Structures are given as C-alpha cells and as structure tokens.
Design a protein with these regions (language model features):
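Active-site-adjacent structural elements in enzyme catalytic cores
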Residues: 1-228
C-alpha cells in the first residue's frame, strides 16, 4: 500500500473515496515518467486523459524496505535515503544484494532508455564519448559536474547539476531527452553512492543492464551498438 504526498493525488483519492489500483504510467522496463508530457508521449491514446500535478518533486521512485524478516534491508533505494532511515532506526541498514527479483526495479535491466547506456569512471566520460563519436555513434553524454567545463565532441550533451537532489529530480528527463535527440549510445558515470546518490547509481546500473532478447513483436527501436 502506498499513499502519495502530493496535493493533487491526495485530492483525487479523497474525491474517489476508495483505494486505487493502477499500474505505473510507463511501459515495463522503460524510463520512468516525471512529467505529464512524458506519460502522454509514452502511452499516447492508450489512456483517456492525464491528470497533471506538475513535475515530480523527487524524481527517483520511492524507497522500498523489506520488513518481513528479523532484519530490515533496503530492497530499492529511493527518495528517502538510507541515511534518513538509519537516523530513525539508530542502526545500519543494508541494501539487499541478491539476484532474486522481489520488488519493482530489481530486474537487471530497468528504467532503460532506447539508447544503450555505458557507464565509465567520471574522468573517462569525455574520452569515451569522443571515442564512440569517432566510431560513428550518435553519442549522448551525461556530463558530471567535475568536467562540465571540458568541451566534448558528441551528438548531445546534458551537463549534470551539482546538487544530488536536482540530479535525482532530473535523471529520467535527461535520459528521455537524449533518446528524443536521436542518440543511440549514452555515456554516463556513477555518482558517489551516499544520500540520493545511492538511488541514482542504482537506476543508472539498471539502465545500463543487459537487455532481454526481443520477441518478433517487440523489436528494439534502436539496435544495441558496440562502443568499442
């Protein structure tokens, strides 16, 4: 059970007067929407209308904690950080690390744009992007703050904000933007995995994860490319 912390969603629940069962507002495995326009672009005529409450205030999804056993653990890091929870609990809270899928977002490939995502060290982002560009890829770059002043040859560049809160809020929009601009490859790096950085790194790893083989009815919009 989830209860949103947003005046528009709370008003909807109040007006309806009951519980609401609904799927996520995006295709399974693809980049999560954080604006009403993202929902409309992805679902199109499959939905009758979109209730627009403005851009998501947090961006990354909720934190999911396993409380079914004797010891608590984080199944999916999210907007409520591990440090927030540990401050309340008064003890360390581990992140669930087994391969068993128990909750949304634990699949090896999830939150994935059409373009292939490749993760490299922050100091290698520019060099790897330019190498892929020379090989003929339409390269999109999530440029970390440490190198935002460095020119980079690429098809499209998003200069990331220095604030982890702003990064978490904008992550999915950045990935969608690079898709919309026709990139077939996205070069990115992981942030420091503390605070919201833990959730951001989790989403980027899933976005870069191995894609399931498509069925004849589910061919990829952009064929995976080899950055080497």
């Amino acid at each position: 059970m989830r209860v949103p912390d947003h005046p528009v969603a709370l008003a909807l629940l109040s007006a309806f007067g009951g519980g609401v069962a609904a799927p996520s507002a995006n295709r399974f495995g693809s980049v999560s929407p954080t604006t009403a326009n993202h929902v409309r672009a992805e679902l199109g005529d499959d939905v009758d209308f979109v209730l627009d409450g403005g851009p998501c205030q947090v961006g990354v999804e909720s934190t999911i904690v396993d409380a079914t056993g004797d010891a608590l653990s984080i199944l999916r890091p999210g907007g409520v950080t591990r440090e927030d929870l540990e401050a309340v609990l008064g003890r360390p809270l581990p992140v669930h690390s087994t391969s068993r899928v128990r909750v949304p977002g634990q699949h090896p490939s999830h939150y994935a744009p059409r373009a292939r995502v490749v993760l490299v060290a922050p100091e290698k982002v520019v060099a790897e992007a330019e190498r892929a560009h020379e090989l003929g890829h339409r390269v999109g770059v999530l440029l970390p703050p440490s190198v935002t002043d460095t020119p980079v040859k690429a098809h499209a560049v998003v200069a990331l904000p220095g604030s982890m809160a702003a990064y978490a809020r904008g992550l999915y929009g950045f990935l969608r933007e690079l898709d919309e601009r026709g990139c077939d490859l996205i070069i990115a790096s992981l942030p420091v995995e503390e605070g919201l950085g833990l959730a951001i790194a989790n989403r980027l790893r899933r976005a870069a994860g191995p894609r399931p083989a498509p069925t004849p009815f589910d061919a990829p919009a952009v064929a995976p490319a080899d950055p080497s």
